[in-house]
């Protein structure tokens, strides 16, 4: 048995703020993860699934028409091409293998845009695990294609009507369920947030994104990019891209939060720049709170970014200045969604469109030869009806 212990904190952020009943389950998970990371057979099986089931490595595509500046190259890391349609599949396969290693028979998950739910459903179908997915009722309505996909693959999808009926409420219900079933079930958390050891586990299973990007950039350009850019909700696709570049000081790390209707309105989801530190979802992290410390509702056109907090490592990277966090509005994301489709023939997820929007803005302002890499974290099939309704002037 390994004696290695993971650090539960990133600076002042992170920790394990959960009911005492869940502490043994989290410690069991930490031990299993550490041992798995030292087990060549586990790593070989995970790598094989990523390659021969999920389709890694994913392409690094140089856009031909997106950049508004001839001095700026914009590359896309194509996680939209991964089986399941988004980056979520990477770490879900890892956690599902961990669950089997621990002898668990059931998986509990939460989902916002439905991409994590789809990834969890496909992993459970593949590995013979029972699957239960909690999803905010609003998200069930706006992500009906993904709901059908989950059910088609055998998952039980449970709409959550409490609170704002979005991702944070689905997270709360999933955690509540796990509190009573952890002996037989594994909670397969979908982002790099929540109680320790989830932020570290998710980062390590998503790290492949940045590792591949670094290798591909050196092959294509003979150097590292000037910046890597990713959207940030909970933060898993961004930390997957950032992880292998954190120790490369020449590479700027840029996260893009959802500004919603505008940062100066109550309708946004940007806790890193506009939140206050608090305890939520088992961790200490920036949180959208009112003057009395109550959790404020987050808002984003993209269900996957509609979250009032953020992963603790992003909070630490922001606090230390290693990463820079910007924001993009609904309108900017919608414009980028259409622009990428028209310019490159690629339909991005609305989440990813936030990062595209900022990359185009940044490219416009560059005054020297620059290489940007955007993590195209998912494809936009799930969003076409939402966008169509908005463009046709319907209420969404």
From Swiss-Prot:
Family the entry assigns: Belongs to the TrpB family.
N6-(pyridoxal phosphate)lysine found at: 88
Keyword Iron: no
GO MF term list: tryptophan synthase activity
Listed name of the protein: Tryptophan synthase beta chain
Organism phylogeny: Bacteria, Pseudomonadati, Pseudomonadota, Gammaproteobacteria, Alteromonadales
Record-linked CDD domains: Trp-synth_B (cd06446)
Biochemical pathway: Amino-acid biosynthesis; L-tryptophan biosynthesis; L-tryptophan from chorismate: step 5/5
Any one GO CC term of the record: cytoplasm
A Pfam family of this chain: PALP
Class of this enzyme: lyase
PANTHER family: TRYPTOPHAN SYNTHASE, TRYPTOPHAN SYNTHASE-RELATED
Catalytic activity: (1S,2R)-1-C-(indol-3-yl)glycerol 3-phosphate + L-serine = D-glyceraldehyde 3-phosphate + L-tryptophan + H2O
Organism: Shewanella sp. (strain W3-18-1)
Subunit annotation: Tetramer of two alpha and two beta chains.
PROSITE patterns per UniProt: TRP_SYNTHASE_BETA
Function according to Swiss-Prot or TrEMBL: The beta subunit is responsible for the synthesis of L-tryptophan from indole and L-serine.
EC number: 4.2.1.20
Keyword list, A-Z: Amino-acid biosynthesis, Aromatic amino acid biosynthesis, Lyase, Pyridoxal phosphate, Tryptophan biosynthesis
HAMAP family per the UniProt record, alphabetical: Trp_synth_beta (MF_00133)
């Amino acid at each position: 048995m390994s004696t290695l212990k993971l650090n539960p904190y990133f600076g002042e952020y992170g920790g394990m703020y959960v009911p005492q009943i869940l502490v043994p389950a989290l410690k069991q998970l930490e031990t299993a993860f550490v041992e798995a990371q030292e087990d060549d057979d586990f790593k070989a099986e995970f790598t094989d699934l990523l390659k021969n089931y999920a389709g890694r490595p994913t392409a690094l595509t140089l856009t031909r028409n997106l950049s508004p500046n001839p001095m700026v190259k914009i590359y896309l890391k194509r996680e939209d091409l991964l089986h399941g349609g988004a980056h979520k599949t990477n770490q879900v396969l890892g956690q599902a293998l961990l669950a089997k290693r621990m002898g668990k028979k059931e998986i509990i998950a939460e989902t916002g845009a439905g991409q994590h739910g789809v990834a969890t459903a496909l992993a459970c179908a593949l590995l013979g695990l029972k699957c239960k997915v909690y999803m905010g009722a609003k998200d069930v309505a706006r992500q009906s294609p993904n709901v059908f996909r989950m059910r088609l693959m055998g998952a039980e999808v449970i709409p959550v009507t409490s609170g704002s009926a979005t991702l944070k409420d689905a997270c709360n219900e999933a955690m509540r369920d796990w509190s009573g079933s952890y002996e037989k079930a594994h909670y397969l958390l979908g982002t790099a947030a929540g109680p320790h050891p989830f932020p570290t586990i998710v980062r390590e299973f998503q790290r492949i994104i940045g590792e591949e990007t670094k290798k591909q950039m050196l092959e294509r350009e003979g150097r590292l990019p000037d910046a890597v850019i990713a959207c940030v909700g909970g933060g898993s696709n961004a930390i997957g891209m950032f992880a292998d570049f954190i120790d490369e000081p020449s590479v700027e790390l840029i996260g893009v939060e959802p500004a919603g209707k505008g940062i100066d309105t109550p309708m946004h989801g940007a806790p890193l720049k506009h939140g206050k530190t608090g305890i939520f979802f088992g961790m200490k992290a920036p949180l959208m709170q009112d003057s009395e410390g109550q959790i404020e509702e987050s808002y984003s056109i993209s269900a996957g970014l509609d979250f009032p907090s953020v992963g603790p490592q992003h909070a630490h990277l922001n606090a230390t200045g290693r990463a820079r966090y910007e924001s993009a509005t609904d309108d900017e994301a919608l414009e980028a969604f259409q622009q990428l489709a028209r310019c490159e023939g690629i339909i991005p997820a609305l989440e990813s469109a936030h990062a595209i929007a900022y990359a185009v803005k940044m490219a416009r302002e560059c005054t020297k030869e620059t290489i940007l890499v955007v993590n195209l974290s998912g494809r936009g099939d799930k969003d076409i009806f939402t966008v169509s309704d908005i463009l046709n002037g319907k209420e969404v």
